[in-house]
Amino acid sequence: MLSDTICAIASGQINQAISIIRISGPNAFKIMEKIFLGKVGKSMEITFGWIHDDNQKIDQVLVLWFAGNKNFVGEDTVEINAHGGVLNTNLILELILKTKLARLANPGEFSLRAFLNGKIDLVKAQAINDLIHAEVKVQHQAALNQFLGKSSNFIKNLIEKIEEIIGIIEVNIDYPEYDDVEILTSDVLLPKINQLLADFDQLIKIANNSRLIYQGIKTCLVGAPNSGKSSLLNILINENKAIISEIPGTTRDVVEGNFVLDGLLFKLFDTAGIRKTTEKIEQIGIEKSYESIKKADLILHIIDASEKNRQNLDLKAKARPDQVYLKIYNKSDLLENQEEFKDEILISAKYQKIENLLEKIKSIFAFLGKNKEFVANSFQISQIELGKLAILDAKTSLESGFGPEIAIVDLRIAWKELKTIFGRVDDENLLDSIFSKFCLGK
C-alpha cells in the first residue's frame, strides 16, 4: 500500500480563495518536476512558480515541500496552494493523475498512512476526523481532548493494570520454585479482578455520556394535539419548519431540527399529537410519535395549561430510567391565575417566553460540559465493553474453580481489546472501516 503515490484535493470541492492539492508517496517530487515551473524546494520550504501542462500555464501557485518523515503523513509529501476555483483546482488534480505516477487517494488515506507510518495512533487519527466534523463547542473540546491524549491516559491506565495481573500470573506459572514469588490462588486473584471490573464500570459510565456529546441529545416533543409542540420547535430552531394550525392533527409526520444550548447539540423531533382517533393517517403519525419517544434522550411533554379538561397522557410511565422526562405547561399567556403552576415548568410558546425551560435543560445536562478529560467515540466504547466482557469471563473461570492459568487467557483478550483502541491490530478490514469515514484528502 505504501509503495505507491496518492493525491487528492484536501480543501474540498467549493469555490474558495485558496485550495490545497496534496501529493504523498515516493513519486511526489518526481511529479512536481514534470508539472511545476519553479524551484524544487528543500524539506519544510515554500517555493513559488507555475503549474503547467506542456508549457501551457495553468495556475501560479505556492508549493510546500516535505521530504522524508518530517510531516503529518510520514513520507515525501507536496502540498500545492492554488487559486481556489473548483475548475482550476480540478485541472491541477487531473494533470497530476495524467503523469501516471499517482492515483487518487481514498477517503482518509493520508491519515491512514500517517497511522501506518507511526506518526499518529488510532485515537489521534479519529480525533482529527471528529475535529473536522464538530458542530458545537462541546464536540470540539471533546475531540481536542482526544487529540491531546487526555482520554488515552484513562485507557492506558487500565491496560497497565491488566498487564500487571498478567505478569504476576506468568511469573507464578514459569517460576513456581522462586521463594520470593507470591503464591497466586483464586482467592488472591479474585479481589484484583473485581477491582479491575469496578474500574471498567466507572470508565464505561463516563464514556457513555460521550454519545450525547458526539451524536447530540435526541429530544422528542410530545403531547396532545394543539398543545404547542410545533410552536416550541419553531422557536428553538429559529425557523418556521413545523406547520402551526388550530386544526387538531395537523402534524402527521415527525418534523426534525437542531438547536444549540450551552454549547451542546440538541436534535429535536416534533411528533404528531397523541389522542384517540379513527383517522388512519393520523394513527400512523401517532405510532411514529411513540417510536420517537423510545429513541429519545430527552422527552419534552407539552401540555396546554389553559385547557380545563386536559387529556391524561401518562407518558412519564413510558420513559426509561436512562431518559430525561420533563412535563411542560404551555400557553401561560391564557391563564388568569398561574398559582396552580408555581412548581411546574410554565411557558408561552406564542410569546417566546421559554427561559425557565431552557434553564432547566441546561441544569440537567451541565455535567456533560464538566467532563473535560475523558470522552470516547462509539468504536472506543465498544472496545472497552468487549474488554470488560473478557474480564468477566476471567472472573467466572476463577469462581468455577479453574486456576489462574485459565483466567490469563481472558485477561489477554481484554488487553488486546483495549490495545485495539490505539491501533495495535492486525485486522486490515477494521482499519479500512475506520479511515473510510474520513474526508477525501485527509
UniProtKB/Swiss-Prot annotation:
GO molecular function, one term: GTP binding
Sites where the protein binds (6S)-5-formyl-5,6,7,8-tetrahydrofolate: 22, 79, 119, 442
Major localization class: cytoplasm
Pfam families according to UniProt: MMR_HSR1, MnmE_helical, TrmE_N
Domain TrmE-type G span(s) in chain numbering: 216-366
Residues that coordinate or bind K(+): 226, 245, 247, 250
One GO CC annotation: cytosol
Gene3D superfamilies: P-loop containing nucleotide triphosphate hydrolases (3.40.50.300), Probable tRNA modification gtpase trme, domain 1 (3.30.1360.120), tRNA modification GTPase MnmE domain 2 (1.20.120.430)
SUPFAM superfamilies: Folate-binding domain (SSF103025), P-loop containing nucleoside triphosphate hydrolases (SSF52540), TrmE connector domain (SSF116878)
Cofactor note: Binds 1 potassium ion per subunit.
Cofactor: K(+)
Function description: Exhibits a very high intrinsic GTPase hydrolysis rate. Involved in the addition of a carboxymethylaminomethyl (cmnm) group at the wobble position (U34) of certain tRNAs, forming tRNA-cmnm(5)s(2)U34.
Family, per entry: Belongs to the TRAFAC class TrmE-Era-EngA-EngB-Septin-like GTPase superfamily. TrmE GTPase family.
Protein name, entry field: tRNA modification GTPase MnmE
